[in-house]
Each structure stands twice: as C-alpha cells, then as structure tokens.
Swiss-Prot record:
InterPro entries: aa-tRNA-synth_I_CS, aa-tRNA-synth_Ia, Anticodon_Ia_Val, M/V/L/I-tRNA-synth_anticd-bd, Rossmann-like_a/b/a_fold, tRNA-bd_arm, tRNAsynth_Ia_anticodon-bd, Val-tRNA_synth_C_sf. A motif ('HIGH' region) lies at residues 47-57. One of its GO terms (cellular component) is cytosol. This is Valine--tRNA ligase. PROSITE patterns: AA_TRNA_LIGASE_I. It comes from Geobacter sulfurreducens (strain ATCC 51573 / DSM 12127 / PCA). It is found in: Cytoplasm. GO terms for biological process: valyl-tRNA aminoacylation. Monomer. Belongs to the class-I aminoacyl-tRNA synthetase family. ValS type 1 subfamily. Gene3D superfamilies: HUPs (3.40.50.620), Isoleucyl-tRNA Synthetase, Domain 1 (1.10.730.10), Valyl-tRNA synthetase, C-terminal domain (1.10.287.380), Valyl/Leucyl/Isoleucyl-tRNA synthetase, editing domain (3.90.740.10). It catalyses: tRNA(Val) + L-valine + ATP = L-valyl-tRNA(Val) + AMP + diphosphate.
Amino acid sequence: MAEKELAKVYEPTAVERKWYETWEQEGYFRANPDSGKPSYSIVIPPPNVTGALHMGHALNNTLQDILCRWKRMNGYEVLWMPGTDHAGIATQNVVERQLAGEGTSRHELGREAFIERVWKWKAESGGQIIGQLKRLGASCDWGRERFTMDEGLSRAVREVFVRLYEEGLIYRDNRLINWCPRCHTALSDIEVEHEDKAGNLWHIRYPVVGEPGRFVVVATTRPETMLGDTAVAVHPEDERYADLVGKKVLLPLVNREIPVVADGYVDREFGTGVVKITPAHDFNDFEVGRRHNLDLLNVFDESAVVNSAGHQYEGMERFAARKRVVEDLEALGLLEKIDDHAHAVGGCYRCKTVVEPYLSLQWYVKVGPLAERALAAVKDGRTRIVPQQWENTYYDWMENIKDWCISRQIWWGHRIPAWYCDHCGETTVAKIDPTVCAACGSDEIRQETDVLDTWFSSALWPFSTMGWPDRTPELAAFYPTSCLVTGFDILFFWVARMMMMGLHFMNEVPFSDVYIHALVRDAQGQKMSKSKGNVIDPLVVIDQYGTDAFRFTLAAFAAQGRDIKLAEERIAGYRNFVNKIWNASRFALMNLEGFEPDTVDPATLDLSNADRWILHRLNSAAAETAEALEAYRFNDAAGTLYRFTWSEFCDWYIELAKDDLYRGDDARKETARYVLWLVLENLLRLLHPFMPFITEEIWQTLPGARPAPSIMVAGYPRSVPERDFPDGAAEMELVMEVIRGIRNIRGEMDVAPSREIAAILSCGSAESLHLLKRNEVYVMSLARLSDLAIGQQLERPADAAIQVAGDVEIAVPLKGLVNVEEEEKRLLKEIGKLDKEIEMFGRKLENPSFVERAPADVVAKEREKLAEVTQKKDVLLASLEKIRKLA
C-alpha cells in the first residue's frame, strides 16, 4: 500500500529541500573507488569562487547532473567531482573594493596581510555558488569538493611547474603581452573582451630621408604609439613603393630615422598601403620586428603613461598624448587627413580598461611539443568532441598555437616557484622553498613576485583533484574521466590545455568525450547582459516554477549546436508538465489503493490492446531515451519523455484504462491496475535524471516493495522483450487515429466536446473492420459517441463531415448538430480577421526598406507569422466549404 497520499497541489520548495537533504545524508552522491563497479566520472568546470549561479552555469550543471544520475541508475560508480576556481584577478578585485571602502589598499596592507584577507573573504563569503548548485539538484560528491588553491592542488601546481621547467618547456622572455594598465597585470586572450567602437584613422606624413619634399603617408588608429616606431613597412609586391625599400624615413615629432622594410603582412588595400611598425606596442608589429631584427622601443609605463622614450610627451596619459600628438602633427603640416573608422578595441574583462599590448618580461610555456600530442588524441579518436563541428575549431587552434604566457602581476594566486640570486644572478626553481641559491649557495635570494595564470591550475583539474602526484585509488578508478561538459568559449583556453597537461603528466587523455553545449540567450536570441536588462536569474526561476520545471526546460531546448532562446513562458509551460505528472500520479494512486503489485504474476495477466500498446510504447521510450543520452541529444531524450508522459500515458492510456478500472470485472480491473502501476513506476525512473525531486516524491508513495531505498539508486528502465507488442501497438495506433479524426470534426464544426454524436466507420479492408470491432468500446468512450456503425462500403450520409484514418473513412452526420447559417457567419468573421492580418504581414514583407534593414531573424519571424495565419485561413476555408455543402 502507498505510504502516504500526495497533496492536492505540488509544492516544489519543501519537497526539494527534503529530498536533497536526504540524498546527502544517505551518501547517495558519494563515489567509492573500491566498489568494483564500472566507473563513470565527470569533473565540474570549476566556477569562480566569486561567482553566483547564472544561466550558463544552470545549463552546464543540469546536463552534467542528468548524465551522472542516469549512469548511477545504470549501475555505474559515479564520481562527479565538484570545486571552485580561485579566479585570480576577479577575487583580488572584490577584496580590493572592500579595502577601498575601508579607506585602505592592498599596498598599504602588504602582500602577506592582503593574502590573509583574501582567505578570510573566501571563508566568509566565497563559494555561495556551491549552495546554489545544490538548489539546482546537483548530485556532486561534495565531500571531495576542491579549490584550485587548496593544499593538494597547490602541490600539484608546483610539481608541474618544476617538471616543465626542468624539461625546458617553461622559460622566461621579454615579449609582447596583453596588459591592463589599471590592474597592472598581464591578461590571457580570454580575459580581453573585444568590442567594436567608432574611432578614427589618422593619415600621417613621414618625410623620406634625402629626398626633400617627398613623403610616405602612413594610416594608423593609434597615433600616440608612433613615438615607438622603429620602421615603416610596405608589401614586397607593391610597385608604388618598390624604390623606397631599404631607404629611411624621418619619424615625425621625435626626428629619428627609421628604415622602410618590405613584409607580406602589409595589406596593400588598407589605408595607403604603408604601415608604421611599432614592435613594442602591437602584436603583428612585434612579429614583423622579429623578422627584420628591429629595435623594441617601449614608450609607456605600467599605467600606460608615456615614459622618457616619448621625449616631450613624457608623463602624459596615453589618450591625452594621442590628442597632443595629433595637434602637433597638424601644426607641422604632417597630418594629411582623418577618416572615421570603426574597429575592435580590447578591454580588461574585470575593469573594462582598454588593454595595452605591452613589452614585458614574463614566464611562458613552450606549448608546441605538448600541442602535438593533444592534437593527435582527438584526430585518432581517443577523445571525441561533440558536436563534431567543434573538432575543426580545435584543430585550427592547436595547429596555430603560440607559447602561453603564464605569469600574472597580481598577488592572489599560485606564486611562481622561482627564486633569483642577487649574488650570481642565477634562477632557482624548486618544489620546496630553497634557503640558498642552487648555483652559488648564497642566501641572497628572493622569490618571483608574479603568480601563475588561473588557467594553469585549471589545466591540471582532472588529475590534481584526484590526488596527483600521488598514486591514489581515485586516479586508478576514475581517470581518464568519462566526459567533460563545457561551453565553446573555453574550448581552447581550458579544454585544450587540460588535454596537453593530461597527456604529458598522466600519459592519457583527461576525458573520453567533450560535450560542447550552446549559449542560453533571451527569447529574441540576444545574449543576456545586465546592461540590456534581459538577464533571467535561475534562482528567481527556481523559486517561481520549481527546479524540475526549470531543469526540464533547459534539457528540452539543449539541441546540439543551437543556442537556447529562453523565455519564462517556456518554463511556465514545463511547470504545467510537472503538474500534469503530479495529477496523473494522484489519479493512479487513488485507483491503486489496496493494490499489492508484488502478489501479481505478470505472466498470468490477460492484457487488453490498450495495455499492450502502452507497454510497447514504454519499451520504445526507454530505448529512445537511452539512445539519445548516449549521443548527448538531451533535447531528443526530453522530447521522447515529454510525449510519452503527456500524450501517450496521461492523455491516452489513462483514458483508455478507465473503462476497465471503473466497469471491468475483477480480473480486468487487476490487470489495468498492474499496468497502470508498472508504467507509472517505470516512467518516474525514466524521468528522474531530468526531474529528480518530483519523481522521488511520487515514487516513494507507490505501493509495493521498493527495489532500492531511493529512486536515485534504483535501476534505469530498459527495453525488455516481454513488453514488446508491435502488432498490438499498430492496432491501437489506428484506433487512436480514428478517435482523433472524430475529434477533429468536432473541432472544425464547433461541436461541444460534451455533446454526444454518431459516427460511421467505413473500412477499406476486412482487417481494419475486425480491428475496429475489437476496439469498439474505446472508440465509443473516447470519441463520446451515442451511436457507432462499423462496416465496409457503408453509405455516407449527405449531411456528414468526412475524415480519413488509414483505409477507414470517418463520417459524422451533422444534421441537428450545427446551425449552418450561424456557423457560416462565424467562419466568415474569422476568415475576415485573418485576411487583415495577411494583408498587414504582406505589406511589411513587400517593403524593401524593412526586408533589407531589419535583422534577418526579425524578417524570418514575420515570414513565419504570415505562413501561420495563411495556414489557419486555409483550414477555415475548408470548414466553410463543408458547412456550405450541408445547406
């Protein structure tokens, strides 16, 4: 007997809290490396310790949880490794803002005190996202939660750094990097946000040395950097400037002679075809400078203020210097013209300051040898990227990879384990802090002040979290991990680096599969941002609609390679689905009162056609769901379960079974109750990975002995031969098609569902005739018929509306059911409204100014609306024609 009744209305908040606490207390999330079961492991992409749950996190972790719960139910020992990232610059900025509010700064505190302050902040305020992930239902092994700066991971970071240094794969060099003049640190490419901005293109005259009156005109978007020019360049095949190559020009304002070089980098179509080369302030120019052995002249300091190399502009902030340089060029008659010019400008992802290409002494990883193995591992299939289209992006990045700048000029992070000797100048790199120089023995050593790029520790995440460099049971059982679920934006910055580090230090790929999910956008397809005001807060959604509805929405729209357009109306729609499951379960439980499924022998049951059909469809749903999840087609799996639950189980089977449940003899009633119980119990287990809370709540109330203490650890349903009834299923499909046909006639003719009608079924074959005779009770009941005639070559009444289902003609006599005159008026009125809409959409789409200027998705939407109203009109015209035939 059921342990308790379900409440009339589902209240998600209380249910979610209750079951999550139970799951944690019972240890269902914990992974045992010694269990002997086949293993399945996922490492969570560690969210920033400063972060709060956003839609990207919600999608990413919902998909991971679906996989983990599904595999757990399939008998796997599942490890879902959780943790957070120390998020160097982001965390340092949070604490610096706190200090500023207190009237102090990190520099006033000093490094050690500041680091202590950050740890204090982390203990008190950091990691709120972990609690938010729990609200999402994430079944992580929270006892193993890691932090990229905890003791174990810090040890792994130092081990990796030292080994790479000793292998010659880490080095220090003076090169160009992304530099934030406000944060005073190098930035990785992913930490630079590019935005198109309106700017200018200044055309400047550079006098040719030795040829009075001759100039070359150089076009630039950054005239202030000309102070650091060490050449101008032309294309080697540009005949306009062939005679200039090898000559010199005079750099305006500072009057320094610089050479004219020929280089294929120059775009002959851009500007005048002559470009200034500033190797210390432009990445492309840096490469040109290396090819031509040009000087590197840095004219800015760390705050982007002009230094002494900038002569009379020394001490000026870069944009103030730009204004003065342009004014001075104009005064000298060397400014030829200024054009409007839009171009991409890079900004610091934290403080939005315009980033400066900056010449600086930094630490690098020589990634070429590491990238070769990582590239081969995807090409030979050891790691599979899904969707496959992202493999080409991965190949392109890895084949054109550049050495990785790993040093950052901040305080919060893994401090680089390098010490410089003030006595002999040598560098000591060590796993344990040295007290003396390894080269000369002097104690005059000082540690590098830079810390490592946050991505360096993140690159070790799959194995460092499992105890490496020690040989642990976790590594033996769970590495390589089974799957990584992540967004495309960090495919190179994180995924590729994990591949490189995993292969180098573990000699195995870090994961077998990489599933790349799309972005969650707003309903119009725009990226969500605070400035646009279109952000949907996952926690607000969970509070309003419940976690299960939210999770199912994300899964239902998670099609491979297609961004999710999310609107609250869609989540509300899936809340209705949650309520449908709840109400269907309440109906089932009322009819299962006193039922004991454990006493039933399924082999002795006399199954009805409806029973065979729903069992066959259950088999199909189980097989289709498993196939879709194996292929990471989350939307297909969700779609299968939605259709089976709502349409086949709730709308059809429950209605078909009511006759047996209410009016059948004891044997028929017992069979119907058993099938109802069996299908609902299996359905809940099928849905559980997607909707964990409501499924557990209902499952615990079902009658009979449970095979497991929680649905979480019950088996996942599979297709089984004893439920395979293809012939019975095909039979019921025709019955349902006939019922749908009769219902369609009701709808078209505006006959109330409550009003009983008659129907005539003229069958094209003896097989259809016998089939419908066997299932007459279903047709009568679900089509709400007062009379039903089934035969072959039956006469069609003149006043009948007609539908066709297979080889069966359905005729519904309409005499006395429809007021022909009133129905004709109603249809004409509706058609008139649609004509106005069609005219409005037509005018808009015939307007060239709208079609050419409006965004493509807006135009496409208008075309869809036109097609939709046109189709509606066609349906009404067909109904009008039928009505007029009755007159």
